[in-house]
Amino acid sequence: MKKILLAGLSAIALLALTGCGSTAGVTSPDGKFIITENSGVVGYYTFSEEITDSLEVADHSGNDIPVYTAALDGSELDEGYEGDGLYFNGNDEYITLDPSVLDGDGFTFAAWLNPESWRVWSRVLDIGNQKEDLWIGMDWSTRMLRMDVLGAKGSVSVLAPLPKIGEWTHLAATIDGGVAKLYINGKLTQRIPCRVKPADIGANVQGIYVGASNWPDPLFHGVMDNILVANRALSGSEIAAVYKGVVAFDEAE
């Protein structure tokens, strides 16, 4: 794999890279987000390898936490944002994430989406058990992209423009126990105060799905690529860097 040299990093970035307990993001000279041991990224899935009969998708975050696809007739790769992406057929294809994504004080989900169609309530992400839950999908009333975070401490809805059919759009979502945010193409669309924490959602989690729902809702239909999950809320500048590109843990030196 191509190696990305980290020349030109600031002293602060180098301290974060070498492991001083910091979770500050590190960026490359061209502004891309670099996954390090301290970045908080627990999974990064590029779909650069063929999906075999095991339905395993390799992790490029350095944590070696694979995820698994679900299509009964075999998962398919399609043209992605970079190289290949995973094709979600809208019928039985989705990804199950590892529970470690809820281990931190915050949470980040980011991915490139190229929808083939949208159905009301179709899911990009759904984590929880319906009572304590975080989901992202198409809203019925506004026809916008909506993130709901709900639990015993209250519930909030955050909105963003719905990614257009047939076009690549970068989506990022964060929560940190104080605020929930949605980003489209590296820019914040809305932020809403939120008291629910990942630990609240993960206490009795039922499903941790990319492309499927904990309710009987439609599945995502289209292609996703470069799915990144972190157990902290990345900052706005870090999300902007992720939008520019990600240097995988196994690509940096």
Task: For each feature predicted by the language model, list its residue ranges.
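Sec-dependent N-terminal signal peptides
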Residues: 6-12
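Positively charged n-region of N-terminal signal peptides that target proteins for export
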Residues: 1-4
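C-terminal motif of bacterial Sec signal peptides marking the signal peptidase cleavage site
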Residues: 16-19
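Extracellular glycan-associated modules
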Residues: 21-64, 77-253
